[in-house]
Design a protein with these regions (language model features):
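Conserved nucleotide-sugar donor-binding
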Residues: 153-168
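Active-site nucleotide-sugar/metal-binding loop of Leloir-type enzymes
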Residues: 81-98
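Acidic donor-binding segment of Leloir-type glycosyltransferases
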Residues: 26-72
């Protein structure tokens, strides 16, 4: 790919996201730089997620939909990756320079993807990137989903394709996003989440709260950190940091 190639694709993974999916689609359709293709994977939703996705595909030629059977419950970790790959394998184009795995409950600023690609163009070693993610907390206020600057938000995983191909994609297990970033750094790539105001993302549902409850999600996060071999003191410090 030429360094000036700004083509990118988006894979949205969505299960029971009828409340937020239309807003996510609208924020992508309003981007200053549109994706060459977007696949929405309806992961066995029991609400109107599938119908919303189908309507978007009828309206926009660059969107199409994959419907998966209902497995009976939301499957986190490896299930998210399986859903992503159902969309990735359904891509009609293979000619793109960047790719993004996106949750179905986000609002992106209009210059988001163009801004992230500019960051990539400015730093050829930057393999994965995102803006910072914020949760609404009422009365127009937001609270940041804290991650260190060297990590990329799992809700909006944007990759340079050359990096993605080298790391071999996502593993089908919990902490798939963190493992991908660690592998990227092992190969000499950089990963980063940027604090630029025009790259701020609104995540309408707190990360980890979509399956059962927030406590269960935080316990799952801790198990994932342990799985990756993080020191218990690091896990404790990181957990305390997320409380504030």
């Amino acid at each position: 790919m030429e360094s000036s190639d700004r083509s990118y694709v988006v894979i949205i993974t969505a299960r029971d996201e009828a409340r937020y999916l239309q807003g996510t689609i609208d924020s992508i359709a309003g981007q200053t730089l549109l994706p060459v293709e977007m696949v929405i994977v309806n992961d066995g939703s029991r609400d109107e997620t599938g119908a919303i996705a189908d309507a978007a595909a009828e309206k926009h030629a660059w969107i199409h939909v994959v419907h998966r059977d209902d497995r009976g419950e939301r499957k986190v970790g490896g299930g998210v990756v399986e859903t992503f790959y159902a969309g990735y394998e359904a891509l009609r184009t293979r000619d793109f320079a960047y790719q993004c795995k996106l949750d179905g409950d986000l609002t992106l600023p209009p210059g988001y993807f163009e801004g992230i690609i500019r960051k990539m163009e400015a730093d050829p070693a930057l393999g994965g990137a995102s803006g910072k993610v914020f949760n609404p907390v009422g009365d127009g206020a937001v609270k940041e989903e804290r991650i260190i600057d060297d990590m990329v938000s799992g809700a909006v995983n944007f990759w340079r394709r050359a990096c993605w191909d080298q790391i071999g994609g996502y593993v089908r297990m919990v902490m798939w996003d963190g493992i991908a970033m660690h592998r990227a750094r092992m190969f000499g790539w950089r990963t980063r989440s940027f604090r630029d105001k025009d790259l701020e993302i609104i995540h309408h549902r707190l990360m980890g709260s979509s399956h059962k409850n927030i406590l269960h999600g935080r316990m799952r996060w801790g198990r994932g950190q342990w799985f990756m071999g993080c020191h218990p003191l690091y896990i404790l410090a990181s957990g305390v940091n997320r409380m504030f």
